[in-house]
Amino acid sequence: MANVVVVGTQWGDEGKGKIVDRYAEDAKVIARFQGGNNAGHTLVVKGEQTILHLIPSGILHNHKVCIIGNGVVVDPLVLIQEIESLKGRGLFPPDTRLFVSEKAHVIMPYHRQLDLARETRRSGVKIGTTGRGIGPAYEDKISRVGIRICDLLDETLFREKLALNVEEKNFTLTSLFGEPPVQEQEIFDEYQNYAEKIRSYAADTSLILEREMKLGKPILFEGAQGCHLDIEHGTYPFVTSSSTVAGNASCGTGIGPSSLNEVIGICKAYTTRVGEGPFLTELNDEIGDRLQRVGQEFGATTGRRRRCGWLDMVLVRHAVRVSGITGLAITKLDVLTGLKTLKLCVGYQSGNDLYPESVPPNPRILQQCQPVYEEMAGWTEDIRGARQMDDLPSNARRYLERLESLTGVPVILVSVGAGREETIVLKNPFSS
């Protein structure tokens, strides 16, 4: 059985939660490897919706091991609330185990305060932060002053590291941003309470993963957000603070890259984006409004309206390259039903320069680009009942075939509705 990485090919919100939930049936271990509670994965099982921000989507299945890896930044209050909510609704199976890496960094109150203060102070275009403290937490990690789960669980060490951080952060908050200082003792007391509630979940998750692999148990690595929010490969500076590409599944969980066998790229049948940043195929018209309305395009974390547009294959081809994607899972194909004509962006044009496979990193050049479109005929048939490719209208099949030809990667799954069962499965990546 293979180990499989699932990543987004766009700007997040591609429907990874549903696909991970589906693949979790075949995996024995499901591991998150980056991001924090700035991303939300929406699952619909038997008509009931569940939104998870930190806990892996596989938590709804029996007999699983769910891991929050060292590459994730953890807000302990959010983690506790998710655990208690799932247990209260009877959705945390007693035979499924949850572990949090001792090396995962902790989001502190001053991270959230700094996040919001910086965004407020920015002149001109905002980054579009969720205000959850993700960026500042990763900054502390890189600056080697961050507080990890293992530090939080050691009362003496936590007090020492907290004192150093509060002194520095209060200087920045008060002197640079004119914000009120945070209170060290209040934070200490609050987080010591959290520590006791999460202590039983803390573990060396790298060792757990190694043991499970040696037993031949298939592992699913769950990415958050999407390739073009990646700190290295995204539309910088309108990106997140972590690496969202498949290669980080290794670093963010503590297993070797040779253990990763398949990479599944999740691609929405059109394109959406939350917050600021370039979006060449954005539709500020009736079609864009229709995609937003029919697709229910509101952020699972922020509730913000998602910007909508035609499918941008430049983004997808770029994602295929940087993540080494071996199979595509197409989501929300049903949202396109009823559109007479569909457009695919197959390149960017700037003067005499054509960019068919990668996004220009220079924001000035990107701003000057125009999308190059191909047109395809749409369909009117309701496809939500389709369970195999032959059930789809011919034009829907042609649309999927064109995505394959443009990327050189096979479509292995098609989602035709929000429910777990509203899916066409063409290949099981765990059988590779």
From Swiss-Prot:
One of its GO terms (molecular function) is GTP binding. SUPFAM superfamilies: P-loop containing nucleoside triphosphate hydrolases. Its cofactor is Mg(2+). The active site is at D13 (proton acceptor), H41 (proton donor). Pathway: Purine metabolism; AMP biosynthesis via de novo pathway; AMP from IMP: step 1/2. One of its GO terms (cellular component) is cytoplasm. Pfam families: Adenylsucc_synt (PF00709). IMP binds at D13, E14, G15, K16, N38, A39, G40, H41, T130, R144, Q225, T240, R304. Substrate binds at A300, T301, T302, G303, R304, R305, R306. Binds 1 Mg(2+) ion per subunit. Its main location: cytoplasm. It catalyses: IMP + L-aspartate + GTP = N(6)-(1,2-dicarboxyethyl)-AMP + GDP + phosphate + 2 H(+). InterPro entries: Adenylosuccin_syn_GTP-bd, Adenylosuccin_syn_Lys_AS, Adenylosuccinate_synth_dom1, Adenylosuccinate_synth_dom2, Adenylosuccinate_synth_dom3, Adenylosuccinate_synthetase, P-loop_NTPase. It comes from the Bacteria. HAMAP family: Adenylosucc_synth. This is Adenylosuccinate synthetase. The gene is purA.
